[in-house]
Amino acid sequence: MVVSPSTMAAVRASGAVPNAEFLLAADGIRKEFPGVVALDDVQFHLKRGTVHALMGENGAGKSTLMKILAGIYQPDNGEIRLKGAPIRLDSPLDALENGIAMIHQELNLMAYMTVAENIWIRREPKNRLGFIDHGEMYRRTETLLERLGIDLDPETRVGELSVASRQMVEIAKAVSYNSDVLIMDEPTSALTEREVEHLFRIIRDLRERGIGIVYITHKMNELFEIADEFSVFRDGKYIGTHASTDVTRDDIIRMMVGREITQMFPKEEVPIGDVVLSVKNLNLDGVFHDVSFDVRAGEILGVAGLVGSGRSNVAETVFGVTPASSGTISIDGKPVSIDSPTTAISHRMAFLTEDRKDTGCLLILNILENMQIAVLQDKYVANGFVQENALSEACEEMCRKLRVKTPHLYERIENLSGGNQQKVLIGRWMLTKPRILILDEPTRGIDVGAKAEIHKLVCEMARQGVAVIMISSEMPEVLGMSDRVMVMHEGRVTGFLARSEATQVKVMDLASR
């Protein structure tokens, strides 16, 4: 028997729920998309008052299962039970009405609306005349935020908030539905260390209130810090569930990838050549000031700094996204004027942006179209026409080399996992055969197996003589991959560290000056 969402909601409201060991359970779940079995007979069991992490490589099926539990997708087979009662979730609204809320990696809030309006959208309190009672709405919001320990003004427009604060609004909105289950997809991907600590305090408080939290993450340290137990998926199959205290980091990696990852940072000593890119006294009014650095052939220059230090802004200016106010950019010792990305590409420069959804992928296009848009090389153009067969073969070979998981090149890129999207974007730039490669957060939101593969690719390009600039918020990545580290703070370069002398303490000291 399948209980309708409305019936289950009534059962929840009455408190007369069936006795059950698990708050939420899914068994025998199968989901197919054209050419792909995303989930194959998987299971997932969530206990009340626990944080249950979901681990796996990109494309393992984690997000697909969570979207099924949140009512976004419907399974082809299997059963979902809430507090022991079978339930069918035909839409996200069904899930919300039954106490299951999902906070997506790309936050779904209205920037032009206030905090309170976002939280109570379509559920606003009304006065006797049937109009929205704004006073009551703001009072309810204040009470809710205070209960959660969130310090926000209910009347502030969401567009004025930081990513971390917007996330707090999403959590408050989920709790306002009296949710029993809260699904969080990569919640710390864009947060500072201090913001992560605040988020974890709120998660622990929610756990104490008996809420079951599903926590999707690629960050191993978070699993051990916040999760009570975890489940691993691989290639659409359920691998196992364990208490986080019973396993080591290496155990989890083996479960995730089905193989040993012998070296996360395969950095090799390669000959460092002449200066390829030289930046002198670069300024962007109100953003960064007097930035100077050189990058040599075969060198990986790591760029570290706290959020807001200006790292990404410098990269965008060097690539011509935002032209500089003053300063000089030289390639092979000759000053160049880079006033657009097209000009940068013509100088064999490549730029992998930090936000693959907004500024990297063209989500409505397929893999082939996304990979080929940056290719301006003569070998793919003859008499003004693109040689489509040669270009398609090159893209297909690149996908094989990067191990992109897809049934074919005509799959829309929005249907790929985050890690596979990132591989496609890297492939886009590898096809241009760049001499200068700028990577901004190249492994953000990527699983441990894909990270190792991307690190290997970066080292391979350095070995081929490419000058690499790698911006990263992950300290082990900066220290493990860089020949030198440039550190920024509040729009200024505060120092350089050679690989042999770079430590986390020294980098953080320079990043906070």
UniProtKB/Swiss-Prot annotation:
One of its GO terms (molecular function) is ATP hydrolysis activity. Residues 24-260, 270-510 form the ABC transporter domain. It catalyses: D-ribose(out) + ATP + H2O = D-ribose(in) + ADP + phosphate + H(+); D-galactose(out) + ATP + H2O = D-galactose(in) + ADP + phosphate + H(+). It is a peripheral membrane protein. GO terms for cellular component: plasma membrane. The keyword DNA repair does not apply. InterPro entries: AAA+_ATPase, ABC_carbohydrate_import_ATPase, ABC_transporter-like_ATP-bd, ABC_transporter-like_CS, P-loop_NTPase. PROSITE patterns: ABC_TRANSPORTER_1 (PS00211), ABC_TRANSPORTER_2 (PS50893), MGLA (PS51260), RBSA (PS51254). Its main location: membrane. It comes from the Bacteria. ATP binds at G56, E57, N58, G59, A60, G61, K62, S63. It is found in: Cell inner membrane. Its EC number is 7.5.2.11, 7.5.2.7. SMART domains: AAA. CDD domains: ABC_Carb_Monos_I, ABC_Carb_Monos_II. It is an enzyme of class 7 (translocase). Keywords: ATP-binding, Cell inner membrane, Cell membrane, Membrane, Nucleotide-binding, Repeat, Sugar transport, Translocase, Transport. Belongs to the ABC transporter superfamily. Carbohydrate importer 2 (CUT2) (TC 3.A.1.2) family. Part of an ABC transporter complex involved in carbohydrate import. Could be involved in ribose, galactose and/or methyl galactoside import. Responsible for energy coupling to the transport system. This is Putative ribose/galactose/methyl galactoside import ATP-binding protein 2.
